[in-house]
Amino acid sequence: MKNAYYIGLMSGTSMDGVDAVLVDFSGAQPQLIASHTEAIPSHLLKGLQRLCSPSTDEINRLGRLDRNVGELFALAVNNLLTKCAIAKEEVIAIGSHGQTVRHMPNLEVGFTLQIGDPNTIATETGIDVIADFRRKDIALGGQGAPLVPAFHQQTFAEVGKKRIILNIGGIANITYLPGNSDQVLGFDTGPGNTLIDAWIQQVKSEPFDRDGEWAASGKTDQGLLTQLLSHPYFSLAYPKSTGRELFNQAWLEQQLSPFNHLDEEDIQSTLLDLTCHSIARDMIKLSNEGELYVCGGGAFNGQLMQRLAVLLPGYTLNTTSALGVDPKWAEGIAFAWLAMRNHLGLPANLPAVTGASREAVLGGRFSAK
């Protein structure tokens, strides 16, 4: 059978690098052929972080960063192909998520904005690019997120198996696969790694809390945890999605101001529990029991996984590797899949998940010619 190669490009709210994956969709299940992470240079990272906070001269900075991120994504593709020695002519298309700088679907005129110019990626790689996956769903009245549940349904669903796929990036999202004729559901639960990363970066200048060791050295403060969990987002009904617009460093500092007597490691433990409790609450609303499979960076945080297991005794807990998909690359593979769906003219959103008025083919194609 002829190979069906697609590349997926993903940089999430954590901004911890550009993940690039080469995937073969010629078989029944996606096959990861090669993977590569391109580090985001510090000057570009600072520019992106500034752009995520309202300030002046945003249009000029947006235009420059759009090109810069496109160049970085193209570099990730070219390095990926060099690593696996596959010619660009063998790749049908690149699916590029881009870098989200605003996600505000709940305004009167909702919008989402990802940068990373697909024209630049196509020009510098010589491969057609499919990008801008979220805005069609928003145009149809949806949240534009999460988009991965349709991929999860096709890849992980099994009749008779009640499964939840939990993706923990900067933001955490879940996909509920009921294992019967009931609707697949999915939504953002709230912060994933974004606040625990922000706090350790601020206090210790470390990029992330490796294996949750710093959180494990602290003790959760119940008063602070209760206050954090009182954020209105956690009581919203789905479909719902969120991002740095709600859960960011400014919000965190505001929440911490009455708790400045706490030790720094106790705050880290409490922030980790915010992630775990918000996830567990939403899961228990869907079902008290089932199979839980975790992907994304959070799957590699042992303390996070331990705390989830305690909060969810009715669930078996594994990473998606138990289902044949490497948890580190699952989201990149999903965007390669979204590119394939666009190429084949097939819908890729789930209206029950996003709230869109109908299914739709997502993304636009940017030719390398």
From Swiss-Prot:
CDD domains on file: ASKHA_NBD_ANMK
Chain sites annotated for binding ATP: 12-19
UniProt xrefs under Gene3D superfamilies: 3.30.420.40
Keywords: ATP-binding, Carbohydrate metabolism, Kinase, Nucleotide-binding, Transferase
Pfam family, one: AnmK
Pathway given in the UniProt record: Amino-sugar metabolism; 1,6-anhydro-N-acetylmuramate degradation; Cell wall biogenesis; peptidoglycan recycling
Enzyme class of the recorded protein, top EC level: transferase
MF term (GO), any: phosphotransferase activity, alcohol group as acceptor
Catalytic activity: 1,6-anhydro-N-acetyl-beta-muramate + ATP + H2O = N-acetyl-D-muramate 6-phosphate + ADP + H(+)
EC number(s) per entry: 2.7.1.170
GO terms classed as biological process: 1,6-anhydro-N-acetyl-beta-muramic acid catabolic process; amino sugar metabolic process; peptidoglycan turnover
Protein function: Catalyzes the specific phosphorylation of 1,6-anhydro-N-acetylmuramic acid (anhMurNAc) with the simultaneous cleavage of the 1,6-anhydro ring, generating MurNAc-6-P. Is required for the utilization of anhMurNAc either imported from the medium or derived from its own cell wall murein, and thus plays a role in cell wall recycling.
Family, per entry: Belongs to the anhydro-N-acetylmuramic acid kinase family.
UniProt-recorded name of the protein: Anhydro-N-acetylmuramic acid kinase
Species the sequence originates in: Shewanella baltica (strain OS195)
